[in-house]
Amino acid sequence: MALNKPNKIQIIKYAPPPPDLPTLGQSDPSEVSFIGRTNYVASLEEKKFVFGIKRVDRRRHLYIIGKSGVGKSKLQELMVRQDIAYGHGVCIIDPHGEFIDDILEFIPEERIEDVCIIDPGDIDFPSSFNPLANV
């Protein structure tokens, strides 16, 4: 089927989502980071589900790669914001300092005292954290 023919209705079938995919409404939102929507189309009926990654699965080798501008930082921001909203702890390593500035806006006032920012380049407030202290 040629894609350049005018006045043709094309239906593209995608594979259905896996049966154990964590979806909104079927999974505990505090245990899933929702990150997108499926694009499953069956005949003329669209079935789109909001899906995510289970927190226990995120503990194992989650690797986000892509070229500039494809949304790697936005995906991380989405997951971190959900973790903060559900009261989970977060550790962010930000070599440029821009990501943490965006995230600080989403920390509730009652939790702001729990935030610890370690900036090795800050000469006014040097860090007393020594990762090699007990090595």
Predicted regions and their residues:
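A short linear-motif detector with a strong N-terminal bias
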Residues: I12-A15, D28-E31, V41-L44, G69-G71, ...
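Walker A/P-loop-proximal flanking segment of P-loop NTPase domains
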Residues: G36-S43, V50-I53
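An aromatic-glycine-centered, glycine-rich loop/turn in mixed alpha/beta architecture
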Residues: M1-N39
